[in-house]
């Protein structure tokens, strides 16, 4: 095949073909657009410092009542009755037997009011150990809120003073609200906005926001874009990494076309960003190669020699979240060669929309979450960065406390877990919700909006703001201007250390992270 002399029509054909071939790498759409990556960040990481946030998104809506399970006798008995359990604290319906929860009982430093107690799902023994050893915390009853809200205000009609989050109970919209504070269609997330501020702290800005689970609005910023990577490594651009149509000559021709300067602005921009994407893939591949080659060897804690040993457990076989977190650990190990001082990662686990088969389905999910997250935490210890890497869970929404027979339905508020040595661990944060599903004027019925769907007493903005402050985002106003934190989380101003009409306090910083 003769390809060394190409007229303009042929060049266009090859360029179009190279676009089609390149886009077979799923990461390319977000990898290619590197525009504005050199924008100055609003904060600068101190020399030698490193911090990373890892968002673990549980797609489908995590069942709060069987994840962080109420344990004190009065609350447990109410839970057991509502969820179809038997008498005398035995299992039944979709309730756990109390005896099954004893090994995962959480022992906080500060007891909860009214002697409330919680245990984690029986499969979460590793996370129980992390909590009881001060390496994890539980934030109670979080969900999207625009302003502090009571049940009376929720049921009322004054949406000017008490606006509701849009499209409650909808998967796509609530996923987007959690990740961006806006419903489906939002283009910018709070993880990406943190990345915007951190760009100039990193010498290679493209590695600021990295997803190991495909595209998400969470990592999209105004300037920062999500670099997508697979669990096997950087996604190669096919037409320049291997022969095309079995021909090395075609590959060479396309490579030349992609590197030539063009007079047409779109062709030239395509060449520039594709060349940068090729370079980025090469950097990622070489940076993680050493650790990847030596996985599980020995027991030393230097990168690449036993560092990733926790991920070799047979218990992690087939665990997609573990594979994602293993890649995150490899990237963190390569942080110096990637020029990174601040990074935000996004991983996920699906299968939480359990309208039926809740007990079996959630057992699989919680086993995978427990095993993956504990392996990842231990790997950060091995890397010497456990106090510099914070992982946290998020999900579409919580679910109903009532059973629909074999599962639970879409809800609102939920409980979430934060892990890392920078966490003020062995504590519960927020307000423990009453265990009730009835609709009366009793105080116990004021914090659900029907069937035990929790009305959040902590907003996602407070949760995000606490994480962002530790990450280095400035929470303070300068010369009367809006603070960095309020810029990326506009609704946070509505939770600025205020006491709601219910008497519940909404702190700007929830306190579960150490000072930055």
Region locations from a protein language model:
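Metal-dependent active-site segment of extracytoplasmic phospho-/sulfohydrolases and closely related
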Residues: 373, 380-405
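Feature for exported/extracytoplasmic and membrane-associated proteins, marking the mature portion
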Residues: 2-371, 375-382, 427-516
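Histidine-centered active-site microenvironments of extracellular/periplasmic hydrolases
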Residues: 395-428
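Active-site lining segments that contact anionic ligands and/or coordinate catalytic metals
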Residues: 342-344, 386, 394, 411-414
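Generic beta-strand/beta-sheet core signal
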Residues: 348-350, 392-394, 419
């Amino acid at each position: 095949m003769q390809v060394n002399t190409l007229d303009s029509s042929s060049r266009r054909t090859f360029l179009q073909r190279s676009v089609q071939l390149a886009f077979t790498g799923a990461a390319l759409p977000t990898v290619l657009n590197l525009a504005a990556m050199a924008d100055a960040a609003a904060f600068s990481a101190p020399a030698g410092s490193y911090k990373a946030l890892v968002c673990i998104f549980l797609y489908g809506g995590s069942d709060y009542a069987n994840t962080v399970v109420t344990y004190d006798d009065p609350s447990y008995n109410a839970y057991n009755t509502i969820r179809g359990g038997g008498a005398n604290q035995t299992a039944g319906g979709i309730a756990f037997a109390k005896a099954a929860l004893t090994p995962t009982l959480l022992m906080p430093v500060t007891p909860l009011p009214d002697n409330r107690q919680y245990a984690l799902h029986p499969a979460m023994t590793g996370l129980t150990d992390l909590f009881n050893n001060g390496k994890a915390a539980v934030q109670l009853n979080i969900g999207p809120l625009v302003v502090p809200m009571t049940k009376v205000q929720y049921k009322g009609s004054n949406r000017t003073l008490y606006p509701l989050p849009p499209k409650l109970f909808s998967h796509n919209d609530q996923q987007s609200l959690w990740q961006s504070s806006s419903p489906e269609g939002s283009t910018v997330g709070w993880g990406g906005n943190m990345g915007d501020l951190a760009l100039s702290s990193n010498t290679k800005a493209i590695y600021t926001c990295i997803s190991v689970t495909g595209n998400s609005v969470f990592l999209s910023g105004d300037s920062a874009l999500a670099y997508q990577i697979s669990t096997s490594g950087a996604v190669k651009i096919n037409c320049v990494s291997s022969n095309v149509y079995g021909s090395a000559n075609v590959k060479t021709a396309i490579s030349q076309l992609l590197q030539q300067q063009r007079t047409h602005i779109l062709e030239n921009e395509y060449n520039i960003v594709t060349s940068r994407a090729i370079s980025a893939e090469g950097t990622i591949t070489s940076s993680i190669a050493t650790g990847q080659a030596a996985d599980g060897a020995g027991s030393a804690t230097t990168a690449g020699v036993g560092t990733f040993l926790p991920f070799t457990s047979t218990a992690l076989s087939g665990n997609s979240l573990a594979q994602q977190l293993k890649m995150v650990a490899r990237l963190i190990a390569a942080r110096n060669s990637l020029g990174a001082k601040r990074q935000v990662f996004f991983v996920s686990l699906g299968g939480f929309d359990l309208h039926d088969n809740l007990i079996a389905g959630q057992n699989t999910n919680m086993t995978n979450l427990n095993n993956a997250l504990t392996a990842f935490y231990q790997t950060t210890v091995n890397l010497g960065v456990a106090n510099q890497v914070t992982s946290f869970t998020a999900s579409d929404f919580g679910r109903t406390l009532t059973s629909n027979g074999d599962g639970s339905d879409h809800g609102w508020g939920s409980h979430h877990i934060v892990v890392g040595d920078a966490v003020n661990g062995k504590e519960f944060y927020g307000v423990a919700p009453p265990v009730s599903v009835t609709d009366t004027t009793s105080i116990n019925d004021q914090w659900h909006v029907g069937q035990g769907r929790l009305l959040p007493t902590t907003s996602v903005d407070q949760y995000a703001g606490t994480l962002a402050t530790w990450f280095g985002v400035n929470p303070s106003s300068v010369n009367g201007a809006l603070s960095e934190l309020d810029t990326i989380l506009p609704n946070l101003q509505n939770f600025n250390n205020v006491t709601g009409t219910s008497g519940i306090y909404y702190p700007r910083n929830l306190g579960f992270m150490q000072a930055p």
